[in-house]
């Protein structure tokens, strides 16, 4: 006959604790199995560009297998089903949108197979005629390092809402003074990232030739037709002084030799006042090239020194509605485009706020730039 010793209080406590932990583990396992059935999309709207074959993508996150259905027409979609985790879905435009406004093509309904959870994505297409087209024109090569920084700033600002249904063109001379290239900065909705695409090359281009500038400005309308236009000119500037005058005037002669008073002092910081000697264009010639276009610009912005003066503004009085310019020097870095771009394309690119553009410039040089040198003005040309 076996004799069982009575359990000590310590053994009983250990056994009860073990049983409690086991029960909690089982309960936690049951709770994990009862994970809420969920499905979600990375965005509520997939916006296709205006051309047939353009694509946009979004990510589906689900707790289990799912399928999708579509309503509407004018687009294809793949894949039409997925599993637990993340799945990239691509929408492709079957046709172009030749109109002047964004159109809704249809809706994608995503349904979880178990549990019935749902979400939806609207499929839209931008118009062939943009709400507005901005040209960032940066002639010359003396400021090329800063031009590339400016382009990087533009691309950092570009997203699904900037420029929205607007367009951004960039023309500059990365290779030689006799050449130029026209690019577009846009949001690649398929890769969900900013992109920079070459639209046209100019093998015989002279920034000082009004005819070349006039042809380039005409290409803006051909490449990116829009309801409204704006032009930014980033370069060196010397106010109303004629292009063929290196110095301020003949009355400013310091000796028998004409001293070029635009030459920077040794060790001076780079500004947008000096450089690219002999490659200038007169304001009157530039104004004539702008006026010769089939479109009128809503604004001209001079990312250059000394352009906010009554003489220059008078020459531009028939070219545009607003002029943003500096009455003094602008540092080589120029405008903070990453901060300013969203104000050029407010409300999905339908509108702009030029006052906020000026504030972005002032706040940058006042609070964040290494040099506190920033003065900017907004001129209303009708006044």
What would you call each of these model-derived segments?
Residues 173-198, 228, 232-277:
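Surface-exposed loop and adjacent secondary-structure segments within mature catalytic domains
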Residues 2-3, 24-47, 115-128:
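Bacterial Sec-dependent N-terminal signal peptides
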Residues 1-28:
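Sec-dependent bacterial lipoprotein signal peptides
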Residues 140-143, 174-178, 204-205, 235-241, ...:
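Solvent-exposed loop/turn segments at secondary-structure junctions
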Residues 127-227:
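N-terminal extension/subdomain marker
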Residues 89, 101-116:
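A short beta-strand micro-motif common to beta-rich folds, especially ectodomain repeats
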Residues 38-41, 62-90:
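Surface-exposed binding patches on compact interaction domains or structured appendages
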Residues 246-249, 255-383:
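Terminal, contiguous helix-loop blocks that mediate binding/assembly
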